[in-house]
Every structure is written in C-alpha cells, then in structure tokens.
C-alpha cells in the first residue's frame, strides 16, 4: 500500500481475502482453565518436544459438514488432523480418549501440554489433567496468535 516494494495486493493472497473493518471493543469471555500466561518460558522457546496447540476447523458451516480436530506440536510442527462428528466438547473428548488409547503408556511423554482456545468445544479438555499428566492451557480470548502454529496449518487446510 505504501509503494515501498514492487508487489501488488493481488500478489498477496492473505491480504486480498481479508476485509479491513472498524474495530469494536469486545467484552472478554472468561478463561476456562489455566491461562496461557502460566505457561513455562521453556514451552515458549520451543526447545522441548511434547507441547501441542489444538484447534477445530469447520467446513462450510452447514449442519452436516465435517469438523476436524487439529493438533500441532510446537517444536517439530508435527501435525495431526482427526475427523470428529460435530463441534461439541463430547466429540472432542472422544477424539482425545482415542488418542490416549492409541499411545497408551507413551501418552505422557508425547503430550506434556496442550494449548487451546476458549471455545465451548474445549470446556471439558481440562479433564485430561485428572486422568493424565497433560497440562491444558487456554489462550487469551479472541487472540488466535497465541497458538500461531496450528492456526497457520488450519489456514493451509482451508485454502486447499
């Protein structure tokens, strides 16, 4: 826009699809569990394996559309997509129960922490802390950049 580079807006697919809108003040939702502010600096530095970001990708928002539970490991950027029935906390927990069953005794080494947003579909996720050593952190409300790796992958899924 400033004309500093020889690039047009049409060359930037992310910029073209975003509409600039006036900002509105939002009333923040309450954080469901442990805040992302309590996360260790070691997790922030991406030095250790086993710290995951989690989100949902919805289809075209019709009643029968597919929903994907996406998980991205912070250090290696390893990425999982799990198709779930719907956008409910019961479906999300069922997917995590299947993952726990699949990994068995290795679960605690692979999933040390999970960072997710404050959506109602993740309300029961803190129950994982009771049945395993996995710590669940909730991002700040309306701040998707708190879990940027998984959001980047989700953008690629939506594009293709």
Locate each region found by the language model:
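Basic, flexible linker segments flanking DNA-binding modules
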Residues: 1-45
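Mobile genetic element proteins and their domesticated derivatives, centered on retroelements
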Residues: 55, 71, 77, 96, ...
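Active-site beta-loop-alpha junctions of metal-dependent nucleic acid enzymes
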Residues: 60, 64, 81-106
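Short, structured coil segments at secondary-structure junctions
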Residues: 131-132
């Amino acid at each position: 826009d400033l004309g500093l580079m020889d690039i047009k807006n049409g060359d930037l697919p992310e910029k073209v699809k975003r509409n600039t809108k006036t900002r509105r003040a939002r009333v923040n939702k309450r954080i469901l569990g442990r805040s992302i502010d309590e996360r260790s600096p070691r997790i922030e530095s991406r030095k250790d394996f086993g710290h995951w970001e989690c989100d949902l990708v919805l289809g075209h928002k019709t009643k029968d559309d597919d929903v994907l539970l996406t998980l991205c490991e912070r250090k290696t950027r390893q990425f999982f997509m799990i198709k779930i029935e719907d956008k409910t906390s019961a479906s999300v927990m069922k997917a995590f129960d299947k993952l726990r069953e699949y990994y068995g005794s290795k679960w605690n080494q692979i999933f040390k922490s999970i960072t997710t947003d404050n959506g109602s579909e993740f309300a029961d996720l803190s129950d994982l802390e009771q049945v395993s050593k996995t710590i669940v952190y909730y991002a700040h409300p309306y701040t998707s950049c708190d879990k940027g790796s998984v959001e980047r992958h989700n953008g690629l899924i939506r594009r293709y």
